[in-house]
UniProtKB/Swiss-Prot annotation:
Descriptive protein name: Dimethyladenosine transferase
GO biological process: positive regulation of rRNA processing; ribosomal small subunit biogenesis; rRNA methylation
Keyword Nucleus: yes
A GO cellular-component term linked to this record: small-subunit processome
Spans annotated as Disordered: 1-21
SMART domains: rADc
Function comment: Specifically dimethylates two adjacent adenosines in the loop of a conserved hairpin near the 3'-end of 18S rRNA in the 40S particle. Involved in the pre-rRNA processing steps leading to small-subunit rRNA production independently of its RNA-modifying catalytic activity. Part of the small subunit (SSU) processome, first precursor of the small eukaryotic ribosomal subunit.
Length: 313
């Protein structure tokens, strides 16, 4: 009897699992290339909704509702749910699922890319995000006005850990400090890959984000310009990070614009490199590294540069 190759067995099992997935999803083929992994565990869905502490008067923004496993439970607790979904097939499934139910009138569906969509007013955001858009969506949320109360978001585990990382942590990065400048961030729970259909290749985590209201009195473009420079090589000293010719050209251009606007005469022997080093030394950050600096450190450094007419945007 001929042997059956293990590869053929694996492919057959894969097709069988795929057929089971299609059957359980009403015949839909999920597109994992755009992050379609449907959260199927009702215990985790209930836990996420509990963490949101919804009020009967709340408008909830749900991003990536999929086939509506979480949506139907949100509709039971909130005044209104605005669901943003990219895939028209899933939109049809979602509408079919709530059609004719007492909560159908509470659902509004936005069809399209949430990053390109003008967000409506909402009190709370609950989302099982496609991982490809996680980072830009966080900042779209945090720069949204009027302020929302909180967001309960599912992320790829590593990205979630970056959001909550502290100075000195291996994963501490530009995303960490920018998010924590604008919001309080808490890691709520881990979610294993088998809680999704189809399972993703990585583990997930749920994070709670609460925007700071009022926000810190800082120009975010200025702030991010500084943070971007220092975190390109977060293990370098700031003195080394600012020796980049591209960085010095940008800052000199901005400095000359500042001086022109304020009628400040620039000496003929002016050196932007010397000016930068003077500021780093006077603020005490010349030998510091971005990986170990907290929000207060960066605020002091930004104020030090701005006070000398050097800007980052």
């Amino acid at each position: 009897m001929p042997k059956v190759k293990s590869g053929a067995i694996g492919r057959r099992r894969g097709r069988q699992e795929q057929r089971r997935e299609l059957k359980s999803a009403g015949g839909l083929m999920f597109n994992t290339g755009i992050g379609q992994h449907i959260l199927k565990n009702p215990l985790i869905i209930n836990s996420i909704i509990d963490k949101a502490a919804l009020r009967p008067t709340d408008v909830v923004l749900e991003v990536g509702p999929g086939t509506g496993n979480m949506t139907v439970k949100l509709l039971e607790k909130a005044k209104k749910v605005v669901a943003c979904e990219l895939d028209p097939r899933l939109v049809a499934e979602l509408r079919k699922r709530v059609q004719g139910t007492p909560v159908a009138s509470k659902l509004q569906v936005l069809v399209g890319d949430v990053l390109k969509t003008d967000l409506p007013f909402f009190d709370t955001c609950v989302a099982n995000l496609p991982y490809q858009i996680s980072s830009p969506f966080v900042f779209k949320l945090l720069l949204h006005r009027p302020f929302f109360r909180c967001a309960i978001l599912m992320f790829q585990r590593e990205l979630a850990l970056r959001l909550v990382a502290k100075p000195g942590d291996k994963l501490y990065c530009r995303l960490s400090i920018n998010t924590q400048l604008l919001a309080r961030v808490d890691h709520l729970m881990k979610v294993g890959k088998n809680n999704f259909r189809p399972p993703p290749k990585v583990e997930s985590s749920v994070v709670r984000i609460e925007p700071k209201n009022p926000p810190p009195p800082i120009n975010f473009q200025e702030w991010d310009g500084l943070v971007r420079i220092t975190f390109v090589r977060k293990n370098k000293t700031l003195s080394a990070a600012f020796k980049s010719s591209a960085v010095q050209q940008l800052l000199e251009k901005n400095y000359r614009i500042h001086c022109s606007v304020h009628n400040i005469i620039i000496p003929e022997d002016f050196s932007i490199a010397d000016k930068i080093q003077q500021i780093l030394t006077s603020t005490g950050f010349s030998d510091k590294r971005a990986r170990s600096m907290d929000i207060d450190d960066f605020i002091r450094l930004l104020h030090g540069f701005n006070a000398e007419g050097i800007h980052f945007s």
